[in-house]
From Swiss-Prot:
SUPFAM superfamilies referenced in this protein's UniProt entry, alphabetically: SecB-like
GO biological process: protein folding; protein tetramerization; protein transport
InterPro entries in UniProt: SecB (IPR003708), SecB-like_sf (IPR035958)
UniProt GO molecular function: unfolded protein binding
Keyword flag Phosphoprotein: no
Compartments reported by the entry: Cytoplasm
Function: One of the proteins required for the normal export of preproteins out of the cell cytoplasm. It is a molecular chaperone that binds to a subset of precursor proteins, maintaining them in a translocation-competent state. It also specifically binds to its receptor SecA.
Listed name of the protein: Protein-export protein SecB 1
Gene Ontology terms: cellular component: cytoplasm
Source species, domain of life: Bacteria
Family, as annotated: Belongs to the SecB family.
Length: 155
């Protein structure tokens, strides 16, 4: 009788661009302005199971540039990966989904965002490297604080 293989499995099935948009709502007038725009970048990570042992990790970015209160351009992007993760201890799953997987997907997102901005006629916006471990630990700490601050109901 063959034994079931219980070796840990962690591998990439696919990395893909899930969504990408570039908006220039105030063009062409805003392009004549010589001021340097302000840049705001927001990032997010989402993980969800898609099948037994398969997880989709999506890293999202929004890059919003403004001159005064007028938008120069806004990019919204979602880069995703499908990962096979099996036979991993449950206490290690959060770190894999929140740190290891986003670290693999993020460089693809950075490249796609820089490319679409340049194709839109703008100088590239280079998104910095992200410490996903620090981001994950901060989210975990915030979740712990939220549960500890929840009102206690005594029965």
């Amino acid at each position: 009788m063959a034994e079931a293989n219980l070796d840990p499995v962690f591998q990439i099935q696919r990395v893909y661009l899930k969504d990408l948009s570039l908006e220039q709502p105030n063009s062409p007038e805003i392009l004549l302005n010589q001021e340097q725009p302000g840049v705001e970048i927001q990032l997010g990570v989402d993980a969800k199971p898609v099948a037994e042992g398969l997880f989709e990790i999506t890293v999202t970015a929004t890059v919003h540039t403004k001159i005064e209160e007028k938008t120069v351009f806004m990019v919204e992007a979602k880069q995703a990966g499908i990962f096979e993760i099996r036979n991993i201890q449950s206490d290690q799953m959060g770190a894999l989904l929140g740190i290891a997987c986003p670290q693999i997907v993020y460089p693809y997102l950075r490249s796609n965002v820089a490319d679409i901005i340049q194709r839109g006629g703008f100088p590239p916006v280079h998104m910095a490297e992200i410490n996903f471990q620090a981001m994950y630990e901060q989210q975990q700490a915030e979740a712990m604080m939220a549960t500890s601050e929840a009102p206690q109901i005594l029965v």
